[in-house]
Amino acid sequence: MNKKSTAIFLMGPTASGKTDLAIQLHQELPVEVISVDSALIYKGMDIGTAKPNAQELALTPHRLIDIKDPSENYSAAEFRRDALREMQKITQQGKIPLLVGGTMLYYKALLEGLSPLPSADEKVRLEIEQKAEKFGWATLHNELAKIDPISAQRINPNDSQRINRALEVFYLTGQSLTELTAQKGEEIPYHIIHFAIAPERAVLHQRIEQRFHKMIEQGFQQEVEKLYQRSDLHPNLPSIRCVGYRQMWEYLQGNYGKDEMIFRGICATRQLAKRQLTWLRGWKSPIEWLDSLNPKSAKEKIIKTIKHNCK
């Protein structure tokens, strides 16, 4: 039986220091970085996604960054396909894939494979959105509760994106999202070592607030204004629904003032971090937890573990 090649998952909430740690690891280990981030895939969305800058990318190239235009969709299935392709290239070079990011659904899809969910259908989605405009998303959430009570319990009544997808799956297949996701996909053909970096809640909240203000100073508004001027972009696209971008877009629409936009952006980012941590706490595979306040200790722990596993 062939021994599986090793790959590293470096997971964690937004603003936890994953990118800095990955850059340090790239200097000391034979690793190549693959981004696991549903926002970093978009070209022209750099400041609001805290994308590594040109200097950092020159030092440590990240694969699966800047691969899509903001007008395009990108599914977990596409990520899995692309990530496995890049992982194979890296292992063929005699190096270790280091997967870094906070999009936990991507990690799950990569690790466990995907159940046979149908592709998005614009016609069905539009019909659902029109129904929501007429009756409200709360009514559609009630409809979902009758079709798929487990998904309805998990999905917030205000989460229009996920309600839409759950109903879309049922309309297209006649089966609930819960039924379909119970069908296992193909597991990843790698030995994965799972690391997670997660600051204390107060520290994380402070970092998120500081980073959002820094993004504003760096020209985040101007970045979104360029997107806002494009006729092919609208608030229902996954790119514009990204945390921070949605709030800035609504500010540019005149929905509220700048202070309110900043407040909402920070709150939305904190909520994202909370969801990411919930995923991590429920992670099925054993996780090596890293000290976010001591990057040197975190780096040394990973190096020691990798060297031990790759003997």
UniProtKB/Swiss-Prot annotation:
Kindly list any coiled-coil regions of this protein.
none
Annotated binding of substrate, by residue: 14-19
InterPro entries to which the protein is assigned, alphabetical: Dimethylallyltransferase, IPT, P-loop_NTPase
One GO BP annotation is: tRNA modification
Q: Which organism is it from?
A: Histophilus somni (strain 2336) (Haemophilus somnus)
The record's PANTHER family line, in alphabetical order, gives: TRNA DIMETHYLALLYLTRANSFERASE (PTHR11088:SF60)
Cystine connections: none
Cofactor (UniProt): Mg(2+)
- Give one Pfam family: IPPT
Family classification: Belongs to the IPP transferase family.
From the Swiss-Prot or TrEMBL record, give the protein name.
tRNA dimethylallyltransferase
Q: Where is this region: Interaction with substrate tRNA?
A: 37-40, 161-165, 241-246
Q: In this UniProt entry, which residues are annotated as the site Interaction with substrate tRNA? A: 103, 125
Task: Name the Gene Ontology molecular function terms of this record.
Answer: ATP binding; tRNA dimethylallyltransferase activity
Keyword set includes Iron:
no
Gene3D superfamilies, per database record: 1.10.20.140, P-loop containing nucleotide triphosphate hydrolases
Which reaction is this enzyme known to catalyze? adenosine(37) in tRNA + dimethylallyl diphosphate = N(6)-dimethylallyladenosine(37) in tRNA + diphosphate
* Subunit structure and binding partners: Monomer.
